């Protein structure tokens, strides 16, 4: 601190605000420069069912900053007991080398880290400075640092908590994706996003596609994305999921 809400973990609570998330040893660790933003992120996470192992709010970081908490987690990391998932909200990177070293070290130990770096624009830097006394850092420098460390960069609390939820899932095998939707537009956008991420959305055609199409409403598309139409039923959705799981290669 100052300008923080304290910390909480499965052994100790020093937070006097809500919401208080479900604490779980296998949940995520959240480190936030801002106390109010920690609560803001918690509100988003709770609605998604995302659980936390610990929450650290460092405020103005006059004594302990984000880098210090990461160093503590790295140097005391127990792969059997500690969370492998870290979410960060950062306004000031006071020691980029330390952040890089300990984030990279944790990732090599099997952790996954996602972070928001606020105040990377000129106006944002001014706002962050007035909020927590943050030192400005250019957007390109932040991008390079995160890429080198292996940190997934996020730009909103919804993106951060969604990535946190993805981190909790088992690792995916293969690069092929089937998209099932009841509206064409989202399917197109998701196809673009997956393709830009180096993943495949292979075209479905031939006997497999015709067999599936015959079991959906007229007008449904099965080329991948699979569009069951707005009038599609829950049974159609179940059918498509089972079909993709059983008959398509990953």
Stretch-by-stretch model annotation:
Residues 1-250:
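Catalytic-core regions of core metabolic enzymes
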């Amino acid at each position: 601190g100052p300008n923080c809400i304290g910390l909480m973990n499965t052994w100790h609570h020093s937070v006097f605000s809500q919401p208080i998330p479900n604490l779980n040893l296998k949940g995520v660790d959240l480190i936030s420069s801002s106390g109010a933003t920690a609560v803001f992120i918690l509100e988003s996470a709770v609605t998604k069912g995302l659980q936390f192992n610990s929450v650290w709010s460092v405020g103005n970081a006059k004594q302990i900053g984000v880098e210090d908490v990461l160093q503590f987690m790295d140097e005391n990391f127990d792969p059997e007991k500690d969370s492998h998932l870290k979410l960060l909200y950062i306004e000031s990177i006071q020691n980029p080398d330390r952040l890089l070293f300990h984030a990279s070290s944790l990732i090599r130990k099997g952790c996954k880290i996602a972070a928001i770096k606020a105040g990377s624009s000129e106006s944002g830097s001014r706002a962050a400075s007035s909020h927590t006394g943050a030192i400005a850092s250019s957007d390109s420098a932040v991008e390079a640092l995160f890429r080198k460390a292996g940190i997934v960069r996020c730009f909103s609390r919804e993106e951060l908590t969604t990535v946190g939820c993805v981190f909790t899932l088992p690792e995916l095998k293969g690069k092929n994706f089937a998209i099932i939707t009841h509206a064409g537009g989202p399917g197109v956008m998701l196809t673009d996003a997956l393709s830009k991420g180096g993943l495949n959305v292979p075209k479905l055609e031939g006997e497999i596609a015709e067999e599936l199409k015959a079991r959906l409403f007229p007008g449904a598309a099965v080329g991948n994305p699979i569009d069951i139409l707005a009038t599609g039923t829950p049974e159609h959705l179940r059918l498509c999921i089972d079909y993709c799981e059983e008959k398509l290669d990953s």
